[in-house]
A protein has these predicted regions:
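Second-shell loop/turn segments in exported
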Residues: 55-63, 92-95, 118-123, 144-146, ...
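Exported/periplasmic ABC-transporter solute-binding proteins
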Residues: 146-150, 156-210, 214-228, 233-237, ...
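Short, solvent-exposed amphipathic alpha-helices that sit
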Residues: 68-72, 96-116, 129, 133, ...
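Hydrophobic alpha-helical segments within soluble ligand-binding/sensing domains
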Residues: 7, 60-86, 100, 129-131, ...
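Flexible loop/hinge segments that line or gate small-molecule binding clefts
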Residues: 29-67, 78, 85, 177-191
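Short beta-strand elements in bilobed, periplasmic/extracellular small-molecule ligand-binding domains
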Residues: 1, 58, 85-90, 106-128
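Hydrophobic alpha-helical
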Residues: 11-40, 105, 119, 123-184
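Hinge/cleft segment of the Venus flytrap/periplasmic-binding protein
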Residues: 97, 108, 112, 199-277
Length: 277
């Protein structure tokens, strides 16, 4: 729900009701810590998906967000020839996933002295906000923009804003929204790849598998398990997005748990790792 106070209330209620484990999403890295310790004291482990937590009692599972942001920046910089103006669109400032990816983008662009970050806009991981905020910025600024580094869950709205502005359709990072893939599927020269930070279904299954393995006593070796970003090209996108696709689709790509956080990969992080099924 992206509201720490509500998550804290829900976590305490669920713990008191006798649940065996908790999964939280997209949180501030410190706000939930006392509640996580409370649950741990009751014998209830907590796993975080889509970002990390700093509690010593939590398990964190996600993509390496800083590395993903860095990859996106490097890809965009190379795509536009190593020079020009770029706009960064981050998610929810203050959440670990957004802040880590945002810093990775800044670090990646910093390696290109001829690239200038002309704006940093928060889209709150919401396509409608992404569209409104980017439209506002594009209307107020006449500066030429050569590329957009957009955190996934905002790219469909950002694409709509760019297209309606009448400006050139310059490269933009895409990361799994089917509505945005619809545009790319029918404009295959737009970009050469998508870089995934969080296919939501796969990310949830990743966290659930780690939590269940821990509860079954497989012996978790470390507190945080990260996966690398995943990439797909337009030919792959065209294989599952039809030509008559919906530009306003709110669905996300599922790449498959075997491609995101496979059993073979997870076994490395447990003393007695084995597939659950």
């Amino acid at each position: 729900n992206l509201k720490d106070a509500v998550q804290i209330q829900q976590m305490r209620q669920l713990t008191d009701q006798g649940v065996d484990g908790l999964i939280v999403c997209c949180s501030n890295p410190v706000a939930l810590n006392p509640t996580i310790e409370y649950a741990y004291g009751k014998g209830v482990p907590t796993a975080s998906m889509t970002g990390y937590l700093t509690s010593e009692y939590a398990i964190s599972t996600s993509v390496n967000y800083k590395l993903t942001g860095y990859y996106i920046a490097q890809w965009l910089a190379e795509t536009i020839g190593g020079e020009g103006n770029v706009v960064i669109m981050e998610g929810i400032p203050g959440t670990s996933a957004s802040d880590s990816q945002h810093q990775g983008m800044l670090d990646g662009f910093a390696e290109y002295p001829d690239i200038t970050v002309v704006a940093e806009i928060a889209h709150m991981w919401t396509p409608q906000i992404a569209q409104a905020e980017l439209q506002k910025w594009l209307s107020a600024n006449t500066i030429e923009v050569d590329g957009f580094a957009v955190q996934s869950s905002g790219e469909s709205g950002a694409l709509n804003a760019l297209e309606s502005s009448g400006r050139p359709m310059v490269p933009m990072a895409l990361g799994g929204e089917i509505g945005a893939f619809c545009y790319w599927r029918n404009n295959p020269d737009f970009i050469d790849r998508a870089i995934y930070a969080w296919p939501p279904g796969d990310d949830a299954e990743f966290a659930m598998n780690v939590l269940l393995r821990t509860m079954y006593g497989q012996g978790l070796k470390i507190q945080s398990i990260l996966v690398p970003p995943y990439e797909e090209d337009v030919e792959t996108i065209q294989s599952f997005v039809p030509e008559d696709c919906d530009r306003n689709s709110s669905e996300f790509r599922t790449v498959g748990i075997e491609n995101w956080a496979s059993d073979e990969y997870l076994n490395n992080f447990f003393d007695n790792g084995e597939a659950l099924l």
